């Protein structure tokens, strides 16, 4: 069985050098099950000798969205671990609004095709908060993401661009952000990520820390609602949740393209991941 895993393109290999760290985790798991992984930049032509494709480390695609969509078309003759319809849907964070329309609890979210200064004031009124987060609908790693507390205004770099506006959820600072990992349709493991040093971002590059948890049933229920809203069945997913301040949870993000899987946090050391891939390659 042959598995092609997409990685950063040559221009981004230095920026995202840690793709090798995740590759080192998954290689032995896959090879023990007779799966031969190969790694290919997401900007390359499709291979002729693979059974399954995973864009698991296609980091950097968000900075060239047109090329990303074109590559999905270019590779469309191949089988993907998560179907192309799900990858396209998940590329743009307006999928949150689609989830909400299907009854999934999400973080309150506004979309502005060309954001203006007045939109920020209106969002603060609508969300009943002084502090909001502004981010592009296609983004990763908190690129071009701003935390703006009244009376702060939109940065020049954001004006006139397509942007999402969301309230800053206080529970991120107190309780952290939950990430639930689903492999082969089953909850495999979960972590809580917490910001440190006064930052609001939970990613490791900003000092965020994480630990394994057993997620509360209410969080699992919301995560599975979100997955049910996805177009097509997916082999792997990460669902990010945050407390809503009323003993419930809302979806912050649903990552179906290139999540860091945190297999080192899994009680089975990643066996569920490898088993899911093996089943898909049959």
Protein language model features and the residues they cover:
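Active-site nucleotide/adenylate-binding loops and adjacent lid/helix of ATP-dependent enzymes
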Residues: 1-7, 72-78, 84-175, 217-221
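Conserved N-proximal alpha/beta basic substrate-recognition cap immediately N-terminal to
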Residues: 2, 9-113
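Residue-level preference for long, well-ordered alpha-helices that form the structural scaffold
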Residues: 15, 19-22, 64, 212-215, ...
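Anionic group-transfer/hydrolysis microenvironments
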Residues: 58, 137, 168-169, 181, ...
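Short glycine-enriched loops at secondary-structure junctions
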Residues: 59, 86-89, 193-195, 242-246
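Glycine-rich phosphate/pyrophosphate-binding beta-alpha loops
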Residues: 59, 142, 196-197, 255-265
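Phosphate-binding site of ATP-dependent enzymes
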Residues: 141-231, 242, 250
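ATP-dependent carboxylate activation and anion-phosphoryl transfer catalytic cores
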Residues: 217-282
